[in-house]
């Protein structure tokens, strides 16, 4: 008996994607990684992608450069105009994330979806440890952080797969 088989990846349908992946809560990042057969590694990479997404929400610098070249003149009795425009843009993220944890993980087809959120309270602790801020600034940041974390907890209670 001789068998030939052809395998293909299951098609990812939008109805299968977790609700929290489409409309992720504030202070959360989404990681999606195509499985390679080793769940531990796949999970780690998906979490890393989620942290990268989260860091991009917190601090992103956009550097752009536009080069414009224009030339005009006359060649063999004919006028000519030449324009060239180039645009280069780079998004840079550099953030230290204290207390980010994966709060939801779901495998859909060949993809690992991970929701990585700031752990309630950890951001507040990190702010409290900042020495560069005066006492009033730290207190105000802690208050805002507490409010944001309470909103996050409330949102997470209402999120289902």
Please annotate each region the language model reported:
Residues 6-161:
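Domain-level marker for long, solvent-exposed, non-transmembrane regions
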């Amino acid at each position: 008996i001789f068998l030939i088989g052809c395998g293909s990846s299951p098609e990812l349908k939008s109805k299968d994607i977790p609700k929290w992946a489409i409309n992720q809560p504030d202070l959360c990042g989404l990681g999606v990684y195509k499985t390679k057969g080793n769940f531990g590694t796949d999970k780690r990479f998906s979490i890393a992608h989620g942290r990268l997404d989260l860091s991009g929400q917190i601090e992103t610098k956009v550097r752009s450069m536009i080069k414009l070249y224009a030339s005009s003149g006359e060649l063999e009795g004919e006028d000519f105009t030449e324009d060239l425009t180039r645009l280069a843009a780079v998004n840079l993220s550099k953030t230290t994330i204290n207390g980010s944890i994966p709060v939801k993980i779901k495998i859909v087809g060949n993809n690992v979806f991970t929701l990585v959120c700031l752990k309630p309270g950890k951001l507040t602790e990190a702010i409290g440890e900042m020495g560069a801020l005066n006492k009033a600034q730290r207190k105000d940041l802690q208050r805002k952080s507490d409010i944001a974390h309470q909103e996050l907890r409330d949102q997470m209670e209402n999120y289902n797969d």
